[in-house]
Amino acid sequence: MSREKVYNFSAGPSMMPESVLNKAGSEISDYMGSGMSVMEMSHRSSLFGEIFAETKRKLRDALNVPDSHEILFLQGGATLQFAAIPLNLMGSGKCADYAVTGNFSGLAAKEAEKYGSVHIACDSSDRGHSYIPSELSLSAASSYFYYCANNTIYGTEWQSVPDTKGKTIVCDMSSDILSKPVDVSKFGLIYAGAQKNMAPAGLTVVIVDKALAGRQMDICPSV
């Protein structure tokens, strides 16, 4: 029975290429002759290890991620990073700069306040988040600067990476990752919920500079 193709233009989940859907469908019960579905195999098996390594390699190649940065595939949705980032990056100074230019950056700043001091580097709420501020006010005490690259609700997007004078940059790229070239080396951490531009919902991609390891707070859970 034929059916009319439905085109989804919502903010997420994103549409999948038909070739990808067909390939996934054909292998749902027997992945590459293994006799089992990917959903059934052990995550510690060599075959799943190959899937994981290939996925990582393809993303590293697509974004030209340097060896200085690690790629993580995490659970919990992108909003989990609202807490995970300050818990792991605020450090002993417990201070961070946040650019509030939309709904999600505002929520991220509010969550970060639970773990330390949040300095608002810029705020576009005075005009309904209809613009990206041209200037930043950075705190000398902050350990990183946070911003959301593309604001789907308000329709604004940062056209270039903000100049933070060397301060670590953290960016939520959930809605524009893989849409254009990005110099990953400029960022301490990039994260993105997979469902808008990359894959089905349920996965968050984090790309983090290995040099930032070891800054976690004592209260950071071991998960």
Located regions from the model:
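Active-site phosphate-binding strand-loop segment of PLP-dependent enzymes
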Residues: 12, 112, 124-177
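Active-site C-terminal subdomain of aminotransferase-like
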Residues: 194-223
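Short beta-strand segments
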Residues: 10, 74-75, 99, 121-122, ...
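A glycine-/small-polar-enriched, mobile loop at the entrance of the PLP active site in fold-type I
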Residues: 5-56
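PLP-dependent aminotransferase-like
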Residues: 79-145
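Conserved N-terminal alpha-helix of the aminotransferase class I/II PLP-enzyme fold
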Residues: 34-81, 88, 102-103, 110-111
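Short acidic/polar capping segments at secondary-structure boundaries
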Residues: 103-104, 123-127, 150-154, 174-177, ...
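Conserved active-site segment immediately N-terminal to the catalytic lysine
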Residues: 170, 184-195, 204
